[in-house]
């Protein structure tokens, strides 16, 4: 009876060691198939077979030792390219097709990345996508800034693109220098319109305040300047300006932009 038990225990011990060796080998094999790339400061972990999917490309050359590539301080391959755009390059290698998020507007930059990594298929798909976008008529975005604060009607900002209105709101909170925890509802009319009604005159110029407690938000000139600069940064161009001969664009009674 004791002999049978001892024999069984030895069999279990052998099986345990055997399984342990298998797990170790599998772990080593798994690690050997993975590769970490540092692309412009962004780390990407992927399988070698993904990077070698297309022969005679930059990434395939690195994996197979055809191309010498420097290492970063942690021993990862370092590629001095756009780290954010590389995710689209990697997704192309994984999926075999170009899949981009809605509203993607960096086709030319992505085309340059495709050329660098020698991915002809990706370059062709980016080019095709860009050509289709050029043929598709774009909806005109309209922005109007009207200043009637002298007539107690305040400053009104209208834009048919709600995302621009959201950017203006965020900017106003920022320039208020911590006076606001968030954008006040009293200024919001809709997703397309902001109406700043409450201004008081002071030695430093006309000041935008909150209705409830007269908390100072920013000056009228700052408000208009930030809206104008935001418009220009977002690609709007000035169409008309009604300024009553006051000179600076900031003092205009009405500004109309299109994009």
Curated annotation (Swiss-Prot):
One of its GO terms (biological process) is protein homooligomerization. It comes from the Eukaryota. One of its GO terms (molecular function) is identical protein binding. Residues 33-134 form the BTB domain. It holds the Pfam family KCTD4_C. InterPro entries: BTB/POZ_dom (IPR000210), KCTD4_C (IPR045740), SKP1/BTB/POZ_sf (IPR011333), T1-type_BTB (IPR003131). Residues 1-25 are annotated as: Disordered. PANTHER family: BTB_POZ DOMAIN-CONTAINING PROTEIN KCTD4 (PTHR14499:SF9), POTASSIUM CHANNEL TETRAMERIZATION DOMAIN-CONTAINING (PTHR14499). This is BTB/POZ domain-containing protein KCTD4. It comes from Homo sapiens (Human). The gene is KCTD4.
């Amino acid at each position: 009876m004791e002999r049978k038990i001892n024999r069984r225990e030895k069999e279990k011990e052998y099986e345990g060691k055997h399984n342990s060796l298998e797990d170790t080998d599998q772990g080593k094999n798994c690690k050997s198939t993975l590769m970490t790339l540092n692309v412009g400061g962004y780390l990407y972990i992927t399988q070698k077979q993904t990077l070698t999917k297309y022969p005679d490309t930059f990434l395939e050359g690195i994996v197979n030792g055809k191309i010498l590539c420097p290492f970063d301080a942690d021993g990862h391959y370092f590629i001095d390219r756009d780290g954010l755009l590389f995710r689209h390059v990697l997704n192309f290698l994984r999926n075999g097709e170009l899949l981009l998020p809605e509203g993607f507007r960096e086709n030319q930059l992505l085309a340059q990345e495709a050329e660098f990594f020698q991915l002809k298929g990706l370059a062709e798909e980016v080019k095709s996508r860009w050509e289709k976008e050029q043929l598709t008529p774009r909806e005109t975005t309209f922005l109007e800034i009207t200043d009637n604060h002298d007539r107690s009607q305040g400053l009104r900002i209208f834009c048919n693109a709600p995302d621009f209105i959201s950017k203006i709101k965020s900017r106003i909170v920022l320039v208020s220098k911590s006076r606001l925890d968030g954008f006040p509802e009293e200024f919001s009319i809709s997703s397309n319109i902001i109406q700043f009604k409450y201004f008081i005159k002071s030695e430093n110029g006309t000041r935008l305040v909150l209705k409830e407690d007269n908390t100072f938000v920013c000056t009228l000139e700052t408000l208009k300047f930030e809206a104008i600069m935001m418009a220009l940064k977002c690609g709007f161009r000035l169409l008309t300006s009604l300024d009553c001969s006051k000179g600076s664009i900031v003092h205009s009674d009405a500004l109309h932009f299109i994009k």
